[in-house]
């Protein structure tokens, strides 16, 4: 009897082994052989189909299996991954076994090296919000998964750590920023608190109302500060200062190479007495002649910087042509009605051509750029694509994109009536002339690219543009009784032909650096770039410059020795931005 029982027992055991099925009994698994998890950890959910009851286990405590078993059918494997605070990367092996099947399934969860917290944690909630938005909206969002994030840092350092961490991955976010050679000078993406780091057109300032000064030498005899741009409606404008005025003394103190910074700042601030001269040139533009305009009391007062500094009509001598000239300083929806009114004035005087001066325009609202594009193109282009926005891979795969069309008020971000209304005030041009510089960026370059996509001829005069072919969606949220404004680069800007490869800037048709040429009044033959545009319009032929003038002027020469660019009170935000959304 005992022998029989042993034989039967052995038979049952051998039968169980023979009944194990080949394979693993798992289908449609959502995991990969290797799965990267973010440094700060989180929960991973993987779906799969099991042919029988199953169990799962992890080789590491930091990667906890929360659903350790389940029944046959559609199943969910949930893993809870801890934040990595260690200075080395780590991995865990997850094994899933299905009852009745011979082979378990294993896969690996990897986590990059972490870091210990370095801050006081005061802005942790701000940083968590920033990280969430960046992971969703940033144009190179997938690279953030590989960046160790220390949420304890101050918000500005935390934001920089994200951008720098993505850049460390072979500069995948190269187009987020302005470069000089192989050096990134700054990022376009920005995070600001209530502290006013920069301002947009229309915001209030206090001072004289001079937009830009330049410390320079004229010939061998004169040294001073030249007025480059005056803001309309300000104390400087009311005092009669114009572009090209030469200041040789401030409050009786003569300008020198050692005091130009302090005197220049005093002129920006106002409430000073300045000695002003006009400058003319003899000997074929090689010898400067100063004519005193006297001492001018330069006041100081609150002022705003409008989007339009000048619009005028220039009659072209010895022709029947008229050119509209527009000195446009920033794309701002608050000034779109004034922009439309300026084009009405152009239409009323029957202009045949347009000179668009974007030398100092570093961008602004995408909606305003579309209004300007419509005012130039007109009814013949109604409904045609002006700009197409391409978002990050995740949003693109989800079918998300954004379009802006000539004369169509329905846009990706909102319904904006001025775009449609602009059709009734448009010039309907097939060709325009644009004055450009390295400052010309974003929404300004969007005009150039958008019109060229419609086969409108855009002739550029000046220096290569900034090369900002990306834009930003903004979001505002309040923390600790402060507003935080986040503008990450979140889309590429393409035209109707799908072209977006202008990160190195647009090269001018007539390239000339006018920074060493003494400035003349805007919209006149005394302004070097304006002169070239007017000559081009008059002759219908592109101006041919002596080779020396492609880089530096050969007449009316000035030698700048001091940079007063960073001192200027008006420093527009720029960009190609969608209107920010407030989150609660």
State what each model feature region is:
Residues 82-88:
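Short, surface-exposed loop/turn segments at beta-strand-coil junctions that are enriched for proline
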Residues 49-78:
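Surface-exposed binding patches on compact interaction domains or structured appendages
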Residues 18-20, 25-58:
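Solvent-exposed, low-complexity, repeat-rich "mucin-like" stalks and linkers
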Residues 88-100:
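A short beta-strand micro-motif common to beta-rich folds, especially ectodomain repeats
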Residues 115-354, 368, 378, 552-584:
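Flexible, low-complexity junctional segments that flank or bridge functional domains
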Residues 323-326, 330-341, 345-353, 362-584:
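C-terminal "post-core" interaction segments
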Residues 83, 98-100, 278-280:
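Surface-exposed loop/turn motifs at beta-strand-loop junctions within extracellular Ig-like
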Residues 6-34, 99-124:
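Bacterial Sec-dependent N-terminal signal peptides
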């Amino acid at each position: 009897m005992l022998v029989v029982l042993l034989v039967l027992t052995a038979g049952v055991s051998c039968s169980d082994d023979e009944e194990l099925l080949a394979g693993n009994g798992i289908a449609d698994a959502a995991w990969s052989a290797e799965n990267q998890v973010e440094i700060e950890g989180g929960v991973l959910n993987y779906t799969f189909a099991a042919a029988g009851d199953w169990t799962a286990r992890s080789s590491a405590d930091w990667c906890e299996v929360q659903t350790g078993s389940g029944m046959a059918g559609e199943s969910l494997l949930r893993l809870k991954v801890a934040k990595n605070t260690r200075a080395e990367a780590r991995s865990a092996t997850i094994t899933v076994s299905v009852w009745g099947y011979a082979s378990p399934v294993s896969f690996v969860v990897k986590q990059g090296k972490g870091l210990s917290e370095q801050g006081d944690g005061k802005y942790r909630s701000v940083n968590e919000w920033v990280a969430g938005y960046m992971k969703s909206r940033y144009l190179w969002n997938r690279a953030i998964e590989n960046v160790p994030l220390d949420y304890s840092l101050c918000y500005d350092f935390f934001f920089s750590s994200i951008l720098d961490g993505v850049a460390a991955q072979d500069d995948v976010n190269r187009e987020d920023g302005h470069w000089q050679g192989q050096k990134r000078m700054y990022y376009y993406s920005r995070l600001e608190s209530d502290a006013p780091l920069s301002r947009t057109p229309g915001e209030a300032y206090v001072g004289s109302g001079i937009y830009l000064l330049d410390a320079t030498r004229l010939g061998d005899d004169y040294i001073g500060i030249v007025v480059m741009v005056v803001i309309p409606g300000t104390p400087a404008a009311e005092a009669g200062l114009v572009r090209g005025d030469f200041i040789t003394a401030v409050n009786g103190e003569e300008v020198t190479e050692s005091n130009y910074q302090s005197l220049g700042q005093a002129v920006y601030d106002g409430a000073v007495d300045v000695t002003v001269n006009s400058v003319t040139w003899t000997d074929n533009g090689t010898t400067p002649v100063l004519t005193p305009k006297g001492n001018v009391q330069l006041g100081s007062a609150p002022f705003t910087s409008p989007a339009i500094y000048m619009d005028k009509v220039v009659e072209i001598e010895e022709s029947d042509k008229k050119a509209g000239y527009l000195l446009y300083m920033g794309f701002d929806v608050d000034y779109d009605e004034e922009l439309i009114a300026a084009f009405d004035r152009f239409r009323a005087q029957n202009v045949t051509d347009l000179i668009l001066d974007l030398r100092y325009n570093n961008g602004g609202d995408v909606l305003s750029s579309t209004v300007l594009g419509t005012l130039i193109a007109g009814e013949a282009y109604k409904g045609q694509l002006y700009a197409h926005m391409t978002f990050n891979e995740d949003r693109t795969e989800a079918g998300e994109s954004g379009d802006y069309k000539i004369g169509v008020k329905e846009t990706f971000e909102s319904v904006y009536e001025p775009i449609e209304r602009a059709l009734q005030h448009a010039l309907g041009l097939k060709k325009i002339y644009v004055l450009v510089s390295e400052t010309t960026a974003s929404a300004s370059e969007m005009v150039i690219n958008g019109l060229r996509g419609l086969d409108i001829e855009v002739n550029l005069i000046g220096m290569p543009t900034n090369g900002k072919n990306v834009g930003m969606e903004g979001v505002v949220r309040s923390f600790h009784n402060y507003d935080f404004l986040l503008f990450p680069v979140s889309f590429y800007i393409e035209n109707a032909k799908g072209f977006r490869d202008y990160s190195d800037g647009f090269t001018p048709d007539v390239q000339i650096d006018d920074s060493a040429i003494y400035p003349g009044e805007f919209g006149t033959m005394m302004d070097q770039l304006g002169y070239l545009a007017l000559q081009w319009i008059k002759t219908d032929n592109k101006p041919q410059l002596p080779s020396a003038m492609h880089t530096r002027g050969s007449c009316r020469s000035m030698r700048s020795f001091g940079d007063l660019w960073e001192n200027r009170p008006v420093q527009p935000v720029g960009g190609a931005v969608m209107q920010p959304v407030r989150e609660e």
